[in-house]
């Protein structure tokens, strides 16, 4: 009921919600993210503010502090107004580079598939070369093509620091950007 999984599931069931991230700070001090001591955080993409606030209210203990830039008033069954807080995600540009050997006529499809994979990652998710290549393979763009090597690397937009994996911050949703 009040656990993070229950809250997460309730948020994903809200009409229009496409992604969510739920976490907490169990410590007695403000943490490195700026979260209040003994508090919860909810980052929700999509859905109406009021519907999200009501879902959070139904699944949480109101004595636990919340972090957020969105504040919504929910009225409880006694007529008392309660403030529910949550965040909306920020878009994180994710630059990516693709190396295909030998060069392939499928490169446009491969790039589009990798961009779709990146864009499908949840708020605060992990983007990996392995999963990007699997998306390309599953789409049928590797079989029978003669491709012997496919490498995909990712970087936070504009940083130029490319790696085979990229962990997004808790409040970021990705948007893929091919860099050539």
Regions found by a protein language model. Name each.
Residues 87, 105-180:
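An aromatic-glycine-centered, glycine-rich loop/turn in mixed alpha/beta architecture
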Residues 1-128:
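Carbohydrate-recognition loop of C-type lectin domains
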């Amino acid at each position: 009921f009040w656990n993070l999984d229950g809250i997460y599931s309730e948020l994903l069931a809200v009409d229009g919600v496409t992604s969510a991230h739920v976490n907490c700070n169990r410590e007695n001090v403000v943490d490195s993210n700026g979260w209040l001591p003994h508090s919860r955080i909810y980052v929700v993409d999509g859905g109406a503010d009021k519907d999200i606030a009501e879902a959070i209210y139904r699944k949480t203990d109101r004595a636990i502090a919340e972090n957020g830039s969105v504040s919504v008033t929910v009225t409880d069954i006694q007529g008392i107004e309660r403030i529910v807080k949550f965040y909306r995600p920020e878009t994180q540009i994710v630059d990516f580079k693709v190396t295909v050997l030998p060069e392939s006529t499928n490169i446009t499809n491969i790039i589009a598939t990798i961009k779709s994979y990146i864009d499908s990652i949840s708020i605060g998710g992990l983007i990996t070369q392995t999963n990007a290549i699997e998306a390309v393979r599953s789409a049928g763009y590797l079989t029978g093509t003669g491709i012997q090597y496919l490498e995909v690397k990712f970087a936070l937009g504009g940083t130029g620091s490319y790696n085979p994996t990229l962990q997004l911050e808790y409040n970021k949703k990705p948007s893929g950007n091919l860099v050539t």
